[in-house]
């Protein structure tokens, strides 16, 4: 049995903590994760090495390590609540994936990079790979510019459990002390859970689906944020009540579609099933 050596960048974040946990269960993988804060490395179920994407000189680390692996999966990204510096946002969201992609190409290591639906304003919805990026805020622009042509770029939106910080929607709902929570009925979403994203990566590796191109990865159904919050409440047996709420205007619809065949091959289940399968 061939063992695939996999390096997961950003193993203690929202996405990375689930990716290393799920991939480490696969006996045909040898998984190594990276950490930035030492106090979280004990939570990793795999080997780990230190890496700080905020460092201005990341090339030495990447040049030494990337070539040791069959796959590198990037789970590092600065999300909107953590955007405190334009310089750091550019380094992490734009320059890091471009640098990893170039070094991975040199070593013939396969590089899987996640990007965001927030490159779109959400004015229309049902965006495909051919649609122009029209978001002009810092997060959207840095993510848009950080989509290399020489690796596999997966555009999606994710929900899942965090190890720390707890700023994502799901953990915000779980930790909310208010018994009544507003849920937007005119904000629409068809992303996937972090556990499902881990499954996507495994299918790409196991079924040799890797291809240097950009792909939209999404659930088969679109839900409102109101419906999504209600799923969390039911899944985790919370005492909260979600109340329908609308933002002014037409709301936000960043739902994704695809003109490519990959998403169909992945057989992603509906959102209700994905939420129920969360740990």
Predicted regions and their residues:
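Conserved Rossmann-fold NAD(P)-dependent oxidoreductase catalytic core, especially the SDR/UDP-sugar
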Residues: 98-134
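NAD(P)-dependent short-chain dehydrogenase/reductase
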Residues: 136-138, 148-189, 195-196, 202
């Amino acid at each position: 049995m061939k063992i695939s050596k996999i390096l997961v960048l950003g193993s203690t974040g929202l996405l990375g903590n689930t990716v290393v946990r799920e991939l480490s269960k696969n006996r045909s993988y040898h998984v190594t994760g990276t950490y930035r804060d030492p106090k979280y490395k004990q939570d990793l179920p795999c080997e780990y090495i230190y890496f700080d994407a905020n460092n201005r000189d990341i090339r030495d680390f990447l040049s030494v390590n990337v070539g040791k692996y069959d796959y590198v999966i990037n789970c590092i990204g600065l999300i909107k609540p953590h955007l405190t510096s334009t310089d750091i946002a550019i380094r992490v969201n734009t320059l890091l994936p471009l640098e990893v992609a170039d070094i991975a190409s040199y070593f013939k290591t396969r590089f899987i990079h996640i990007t965001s639906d927030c490159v779109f304003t959400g004015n229309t919805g049902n965006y495909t790979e051919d649609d122009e990026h029209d978001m002009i805020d810092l997060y959207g622009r840095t993510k848009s510019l950080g989509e290399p042509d020489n690796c596999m770029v997966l555009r999606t939106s994710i929900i899942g459990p965090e190890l720390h910080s707890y700023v994502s929607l799901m953990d915000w709902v779980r930790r909310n002390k208010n018994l009544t929570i507003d849920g937007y009925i005119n904000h629409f979403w068809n992303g996937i859970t972090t556990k499902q994203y881990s499954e996507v990566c495994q299918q790409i590796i196991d079924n040799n689906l890797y291809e240097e191109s950009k792909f939209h990865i999404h659930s088969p159904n679109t839900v409102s944020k109101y419906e999504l919050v209600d799923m969390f409440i039911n899944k985790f047996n919370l005492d909260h009540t979600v109340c329908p709420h609308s933002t002014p205007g037409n709301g936000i619809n960043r739902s994704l579609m695809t003109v490519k065949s990959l998403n169909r091959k992945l057989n992603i289940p509906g959102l209700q099933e994905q939420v129920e399968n969360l740990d």
